[in-house]
């Protein structure tokens, strides 16, 4: 189980990313449209003004049961060991255990 402070920090990052998403997107579009280097530099400086934690690259996918940041399966939103336990308990419809 992840510490609650880490989960709250991740939620805060998600809110910041949603807040500054449009600013980042518009700045990146402006950079591609402008041809002069000086104007690109000004837009680049403007792009650096939002907080660091508002960048989408700083977000992690977390298991929604345990909060674990690693070994997540996108289809289920679960970490690997929780997914395995749920499949063994037949709690995930359509998921089968492999055997050979």
Swiss-Prot record:
Chief place of localization: plastid
InterPro entries: Ribosomal_uS14, Ribosomal_uS14_bac/plastid, Ribosomal_uS14_CS
UniProt cross-references to Pfam families, sorted A to Z: Ribosomal_S14
Keywords, comma-separated and alphabetical: Chloroplast, Plastid, Ribonucleoprotein, Ribosomal protein, RNA-binding, rRNA-binding
Subcellular location, record wording: Plastid, Chloroplast
Assembly: Part of the 30S ribosomal subunit.
Gene Ontology biological-process entries: translation
Cellular component terms per the entry's GO annotation: chloroplast; small ribosomal subunit
GO-annotated molecular function: rRNA binding; structural constituent of ribosome
Organism encoding this protein: Nymphaea alba
Free-text function comment from the UniProt entry: Binds 16S rRNA, required for the assembly of 30S particles.
Protein family per UniProt: Belongs to the universal ribosomal protein uS14 family.
Name used for this protein in its record: Small ribosomal subunit protein uS14c
Recorded superkingdom: Eukaryota
Gene name linked to the record: rps14
């Amino acid at each position: 189980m992840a510490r609650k402070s880490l989960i709250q920090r991740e939620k805060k990052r998600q809110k910041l990313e949603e807040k500054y998403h449009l600013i980042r997107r518009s700045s990146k579009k402006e950079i591609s449209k402008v041809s002069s280097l000086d104007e690109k530099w000004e837009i680049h400086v403007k792009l650096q003004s939002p907080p660091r934690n508002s960048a989408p690259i700083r977000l992690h996918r977390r298991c929604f049961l345990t909060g674990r940041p690693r070994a997540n399966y996108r289809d289920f939103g679960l970490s690997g060991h929780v997914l395995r336990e749920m499949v063994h308990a037949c709690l995930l419809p359509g998921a089968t255990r492999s055997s050979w």
